[in-house]
């Protein structure tokens, strides 16, 4: 059975830390599915979905040379039109599973989590986190590069002025 790592992130902007997460996932799974957030559950303000998708494509090409087992998905952008609520990880995983079953294919999905979200106080904030553990499982990755999106956004904003 195909094992797919589901790596959801704001990707606002995508950076080398995200690429390192992908590198950590690849030896453990058959595919890595990158899913930019369309409506973040914790209310993050983000650049347009289209711009973030474009930036992810560029950094994938520049750093990882677009391997075939890395798939960039716009599923959250589709899902946001069916609800006024944030797109939760559990909702996303169930949607991916239902789509797979409707096509008659089987895959196991693992939610990618870094050390920050693996902390109990953060993980317990995830909608239906226990069901995610039981139905899908988690693929834990390390933060080997200290790169944060906030300073990058500020630097981009400063360069535009």
Language model feature labels by segment:
Residues 20-22, 47-50, 124-128:
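Short, glycine/charged-enriched secondary-structure capping and boundary segments
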Residues 4-29, 33-39:
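N-terminal beta1-alpha1 ligand-phosphate binding loop
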Residues 14-17, 44, 81, 120-121:
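Secondary-structure boundary/capping motif
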